[in-house]
A protein has these predicted regions:
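Short hydrophobic/aromatic patches on beta-strands that form ligand-binding or substrate-lining surfaces
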Residues: 55-63, 118-120, 160, 174-179, ...
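Extracellular glycan-interaction patches encoded by glycine-rich segments
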Residues: 101, 151-174, 396-398
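Extended recognition patches within non-cytosolic domains
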Residues: 2-28, 35, 136, 142, ...
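Low-complexity, glycine/proline/serine-rich flexible segments
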Residues: 2-51, 90-94, 99-100, 154-160, ...
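Extracellular glycan-recognition modules
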Residues: 35-94, 127-128, 183-188, 294-296, ...
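Extracellular glycan-interaction surfaces
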Residues: 7-34, 56-65, 80-150, 342, ...
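Glycine-aromatic-enriched beta-strand/loop faces of beta-sandwich-type recognition domains
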Residues: 312-359
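Short surface loop/edge beta-strand patches of beta-sandwich-type extracellular domains
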Residues: 33-53, 102-110, 163-166, 200-208, ...
Length: 421
């Protein structure tokens, strides 16, 4: 079966042109659910130099809007905190030092189909701060700054994926997370432009100086997602994470998810855009990636675990999106919790009624759509289809635990079920 192509800018799928495009491939990432999951380390030794810090990570956002104040990727301190992440109520990057909003980036990072490379340096010796996004300078300053005395230093817990003094969590994915203690790094050691696209480089080949408290988290060991592979032994503790939170979604292998920017606001948006539960009838959410032409011989596959009644899944034309996604059902083809097939609001009985806990699979291509219930076909209700489509979730009135989706990256459905594929 075929990979989905990116709808919006920033996604690498369908753009790169095969494995030769990347001189170095990242094969996995850490999924953060946006509600309880994070990494922490409370036993750092004395820092090499708190005036010089370098931080680099790749991030794919799950929910760029529904976050609390100061949504930090990394931070430390219970008060007067040091932290770096997303600013209060925006999708811009921001540094806090000693609890004070210090430096703000310019670019809004809202594309949930995209992997972004974020690189920043803090040099209180020379009063220099730099923030880069995908190799491009996003912010620079030469104004006077103080040391980051809490981040990666003894006496303070450093967090990844959580604001250090509040229950505000990152929702999305992190890959290749690196911290240099006492060293100002070079963004070109972490990525490079290939055909105009910023792609990852092999960090191990860069001869980085990590310092006493530096670390490199590659998230490759699903049994120990906080393992430091820098050689410094600065391992992090996993909190509310499991083996299934190590996923193959990565900057070099970008997977489809549901798209926060192409949905009606819901009660919940978790598990890296793979869990959705709605607040009301007619709410919908669509995939980040598109079936380019459904009449082609390629086939495209997705599945979801029905964790509550009241939900359906299927495909919809690209026109069924954006601001009208909560009202317009034109062309939406679905198999629902009540056993009906739907074309818009026109229902046809399938003869197979799913129940909570079942897995519904969707196979689209060759001009048709076929549905499966726990691996058994329940019919091919719609044929002769043409044009571009995307996968979609549709709530028919219920809330509850919603639905967990799998586009091939997690057959456990975030640990809620064993997949049928």
């Amino acid at each position: 079966m075929s990979s989905l192509l990116g709808i919006g800018g920033g996604g690498n799928v369908g753009v790169a042109g095969g494995g030769d495009f990347y001189s170095y491939s990242i094969d996995q990432s850490l999924r953060l659910d946006g509600s309880t999951a994070y990494l922490s380390k409370s036993d750092f030794a004395a820092s090499t130099d708190t005036t010089k810090r370098t931080f680099s990570t790749w991030v794919k956002r799950g929910n760029p809007e529904g976050v609390g104040a100061y949504n930090h990727i990394i931070g430390a301190g219970s008060s007067a905190i040091d932290g770096f992440g997303f600013a209060n109520g925006t999708a811009k990057l921001q540094w806090l030092q000693g609890g004070v909003v210090t430096k703000d980036g310019v670019r809004d990072l809202r594309d949930t189909s995209a992997w972004y490379h974020i690189f920043t340096t803090w040099n209180a010796t020379d009063n220099e701060v730099y923030i880069y996004v995908n190799g491009e300078l996003d912010y620079s300053s030469t104004n006077s700054i103080d040391a980051l005395s809490k981040l990666g230093n003894t006496g303070h817990t450093t967090y990844i994926g959580k604001r250090s003094n509040s229950g505000v969590y990152i929702h999305g994915y992190l890959a290749e997370t690196v911290f240099l203690d006492g060293t100002i790094g070079d963004v070109n050691d972490f990525g490079e432009l290939v055909n105009g696209i910023w792609v990852p480089k092999n960090i191990s080949a860069a001869s980085l100086t990590y310092g006493t408290n530096g670390f490199y988290l590659d998230y490759a060991d699903s049994s120990d997602l906080g393992k430091d592979v820098s050689g410094q032994g600065n391992h992090f503790t996993s909190n509310n994470l499991a083996a299934h939170d190590g996923v193959p979604d990565s900057p070099a292998n970008n997977w489809c998810t549901l798209n926060f920017n192409d949905s009606r606001t819901s009660l919940g948006w978790q598990e890296g855009g793979l869990r959705w539960f709605s607040a009301s009838y007619s709410y919908k959410a669509f995939s980040t990636m598109v079936i380019p032409e459904i009449s082609d011989s390629d086939t495209y596959y997705a599945e979801y675990h029905m964790a509550a009644d009241g939900y359906s899944g299927g495909i919809a034309p690209l026109s069924n999106s954006g601001s009208n996604s909560n009202t317009d059902l034109t062309g939406f083809l679905a198999y629902a919790y009540n056993g009906n097939f739907y074309n818009n609001l026109t229902a046809t009985a399938s003869g197979y009624d799913p129940v909570v806990g079942d897995i519904i699979s969707i196979k689209a291509g060759n001009g048709q759509i076929e549905f499966f219930l726990n691996g058994t076909s329940v019919g091919t209700p719609y044929t002769g289809l043409t044009g571009s489509y995307k996968f979609g979730a549709w709530a028919l009135g219920a809330t509850g635990n919603g639905m967990y989706w799998n586009f091939g990256q997690d057959s456990t459905f975030a640990g809620s079920k064993t997949g049928s594929s």
